[in-house]
Regions:
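Blade-loop segments of beta-propeller domains
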Residues: 1
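Beta-propeller and closely related beta-sheet repeat lectin domains
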Residues: 55-59, 128-131, 180-188
């Protein structure tokens, strides 16, 4: 499964306002172990997700379910993280996310839809581009979170995916931050053991990428390694 944002461009708009998220699309790859150039792919528009709500910021698979840490915007315009779950077989059979359920922190049960936003607040801030991993030996979940306007990158930790989550704990402050620092991801495949994890982030320049040439250190992943005791 590959979950993608569907973005609508408005290239005549103001800088940082020239695009918006309008949907989510699921790509099912039938032969994921083959060379990506030979992938057989099925594209499924899901009709779910926008700038204020998204369900696939971070993923965790526990057969047959996929757990999602998404984001939603509360009344104060702050993004909160929420937990959702869907059965992978039902997603394939229905070609939709109709089976998606949301974890209610108050009742400690999964609901078919979000009613009162505050009841589903897993932690804050929630992000559009974070990441989730589980360290089996240490028996702990780690989820990235960040404030894109401050340049601060942090992590949340929990023994259970439904919480309680502890943090945010600051792990890095981008020394080259100008406008935004974001897309804070964990890359488990780049770590040989659980003594450290490899992460990446992206930083934006103050120039308009539609018209101006920018330094190559911007809009390129930068990598960090964090040791874990």
């Amino acid at each position: 499964f590959i979950f993608c944002y569907v973005v609508k461009g408005n290239f005549d708009g103001n800088y940082l306002e020239f695009w918006e998220t309008i949907d989510t699309e699921l790509i099912i790859v039938e032969n994921p172990l083959d060379d990506p150039q030979g992938w057989v792919m099925d594209f499924i528009p899901l009709g779910l997700g926008n700038d204020k709500f998204g369900f696939h910021s971070a993923l965790f698979y526990k057969k047959p379910d996929i757990y999602f840490i998404g984001y939603t915007t509360n009344q104060s315009s702050t993004k909160n993280a929420f937990l959702a779950v869907a059965n992978s077989k039902m997603i394939i059979n229905s070609r939709s996310m109709s089976c998606l359920k949301y974890y209610n922190m108050k009742t400690e049960k999964f609901d078919n839809q979000i009613n009162l936003i505050d009841n589903y607040n897993l932690f804050s801030p929630g992000n559009t581009e974070s990441s989730l991993c589980y360290l089996k030996r240490k028996k702990i979940f780690i989820c990235t979170t960040y404030d894109p306007l401050s340049g601060e990158l942090s992590i949340m930790t929990s023994k259970k995916i439904n919480g309680p989550w502890f943090g945010p704990q600051l792990v890095f402050k981008n020394p080259d931050h100008i406008t935004m620092t974001y897309s804070f991801r964990i890359h488990p495949s780049l770590s040989s053991n659980e003594n450290s994890i490899v992460m990446s982030y992206i930083t934006s320049p103050d120039k308009d990428i539609r018209h101006d040439a920018v330094d190559q250190k911007y809009y390129r992943p930068r990598f960090l390694r964090m040791d874990i005791e």
